[in-house]
Curated annotation (Swiss-Prot):
This is Photosystem I reaction center subunit IX. It comes from the Eukaryota. InterPro entries: PSI_PsaJ (IPR002615), PSI_PsaJ_sf (IPR036062). One of its GO terms (biological process) is photosynthesis. Pfam families: PSI_PsaJ. The keyword Transcription does not apply. May help in the organization of the PsaE and PsaF subunits. Belongs to the PsaJ family. PANTHER family: PHOTOSYSTEM I REACTION CENTER SUBUNIT IX, PTHR36082. The keyword Transmembrane helix applies.
Length: 44
């Protein structure tokens, strides 16, 4: 039972940190390279 409580208290923290860092990374990429979705389609 102790392992389950540790798991349930660790996973939300790790997923929050993961999604927070992923959102920050995507925001910084969009800040440095705006409209990056258009680059592969209009590269000619």
């Amino acid at each position: 039972m102790r392992n389950i409580k540790t798991y349930l208290s660790t996973v939300p923290v790790l997923t929050t940190l993961w999604f927070g860092s992923l959102a920050g990374l995507l925001i910084e990429i969009n800040r440095l390279f705006p409209d990056a979705l258009l680059f592969p389609f209009f590269s000619f």
